[in-house]
A protein has these predicted regions:
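Intrinsically disordered, low-complexity segments enriched in polar/charged residues with Gly/Pro
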Residues: 1, 45-47, 73-74
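N-terminal capping segment at the start of a domain
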Residues: 1-25
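Short amphipathic alpha-helical segments, especially helix-boundary/capping motifs
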Residues: 4-9, 35-36, 88-94
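Predominant activation on well-ordered alpha-helical scaffold segments within soluble catalytic domains
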Residues: 8, 12, 29-32, 111-119
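Bulky hydrophobic/aromatic packing residues
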Residues: 11, 27, 72-74
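Generic secondary-structure signature for well-ordered alpha-helical cores
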Residues: 12-16, 20, 36-41, 119-127
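A non-catalytic alpha/beta surface segment that caps or lines the substrate-entry region
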Residues: 20-67
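Active-site metal-coordination/substrate-binding segment of hydrolases
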Residues: 54, 61, 67-127
Length: 127
């Protein structure tokens, strides 16, 4: 079962990591740390170097337990501007900012959802 509080906490934590386009390194490092903590095999590359970014791709592998086609989950780490110093606020169940920055829901909400899915798969020993 999806843990909504944990999912929200994960999103809020990721939203506060500065990762405007070409400056995604901190977000990538956090994802590597979190994925390794979940026991996944993690690999990175130097894709960002080709276009002036300090970022990199993060690929993680969780072996399945039954035969079949793999499932791929994908999201991007960079945000548009103004995306530095994000301070998410929650009012009446709605997540927003003070208006001086974006929220970074695109695509840190996707990253948080992927991380929650992986946690649930592992916790419930799903195939």
């Amino acid at each position: 079962m999806i843990n909504e509080k944990r999912l929200l906490d994960t999103f809020i934590g990721y939203a506060m990591i500065d990762s405007e386009t070409k400056n995604e390194k901190a977000m990538g490092e956090k994802l590597v740390e979190d994925l390794k903590a979940l026991g996944l095999e993690v690999k990175t590359d130097k894709a960002g170097e080709g276009f002036g970014s300090n970022g990199f791709n993060v690929c993680a592998y969780l072996p399945g337990t039954i035969p079949g086609e793999p499932t791929i989950m994908c999201a991007h780490m960079d945000t548009v501007t103004p995306g530095n110093g994000i301070k998410p606020l929650i009012d009446d169940g709605i997540i927003h900012t003070d208006g001086s920055t974006i929220l970074s829901g695109d695509d840190k909400s996707g990253i948080a959802a992927i991380m929650e899915a992986v946690k649930v798969i592992k916790e419930q020993n799903l195939p």
